Amino acid sequence: MRKERQNNTKNIKEKKNYKKAPLMPIHLRVFMAVVLGQIACGFALGISGTALSNASKYITINDLWTGLIGAGSLIGLAGSILIGRLSDKIGRRKLLMLNMYILGILSLMQLLTNNLPTLFIIRVLIGLMIAVDYTVGNALLTEWLPKGEDSKKQSHLLIYWTIGFIASYLTGTFINGFGSHTWQIILATGAIPAFIAAIFRSIFPLPASPSWLASHGKVKTANKVIKKHMGRKWGIPKRLKKAKPVKEVSWTILFSGKYLRRTLVGGLFYACQAFAFFGISIFLPILLQSMQLTDQKISGIIYNGGMLIGVILGILLFNRISRRAFLISNFLLSGILIGFLAITKNLNSNIQLTIFCIFAIILSSGLVLDYPYPTELFDIKVRGTGVGTCITISRFGAAAGTFLLPILTNQGGASLSMLICAIVLLAAFIICLIWAPETSPKFKQNN
């Protein structure tokens, strides 16, 4: 009997680290579930700009409410700090199995009201559901995918998020013919990608995170999950077997000496980038009108095309240059370009559009760092809370940009809006130049 126990112990010890396995069907299932969620999130965030531009034809909506409703989902995303803590406490799977259904229902509820305060509340709740995928989806993905594939696949998520975001712009631009209900129908189309993601997750249920289970002292359960999805020879790595169960993490630890710099960099780079990106992208129709470009619909499509090119370019650059160099150069170049547009008067419209498109390409290429970089800044003990905190800080930037852009454009035209964006981006350049740590395994080894 003792010999049999020794053999069993030996077999357990000989299990290979599941993070070193080749890509398997379970990895692709988790990745696809997160991809569909990213498409739904990008769509739900982007749809408000074109819907509100359409709404102004039928209802009285001032700059304040335009900014608030446009920023509503981004304000809701500030709940990422709560979602991150909740996922560190109860795990990743439960939240991801429910949030897309709730997102779909909330999107449909926008058909039932044109009351602006009610609509604002719904948009905030939509943002809270998006926060689940932003925070928990990324944590589950990085905890399941093989080492090396995790950060690479995370950087690819931005392609799918951008596809959802661009699809929302095209949907809002080309839906018409429903009279005074057109803008509500545009908003409600966010239910379609949300329910597609929800149904996929129900048909192909998401697994629990083995790393999270082991870090909470549930090593046997973690190994059972791995065995079920990957086979007998894979298991939890030794370092997680020996790790003490994680105690509840206090938010204050993120502002202690060990994590303070990482928390500030992760939150502030994200906030400055989001200020410019969401402010411009969500209210692109308003900005293009103020820029007095001849064909605003085509100009908008070109700008959005630049965004997609930028994300693809970012993915190509992602593992070829260091994270730190990527951040610094991205903020510097995008800040100079949008600043040049802001201070230059009477430029030919084609030159304006060309510079604006190059700006879109450069700024969007930096979005590729939004998922892997904050995740890499924190270890597994505080990852959910840390990433959630960074996303929360970033959403203040995103909400501020989205809230302020219609007001700034109305007060001082496109030039004022672009000048403020330039100042924020150049501030991010200085922050990253001074504080940003290198997190890329490839370039850390070379230093």
PLM regions with names:
Residues R2-N447:
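Transmembrane-helix signature of 12-pass secondary carriers
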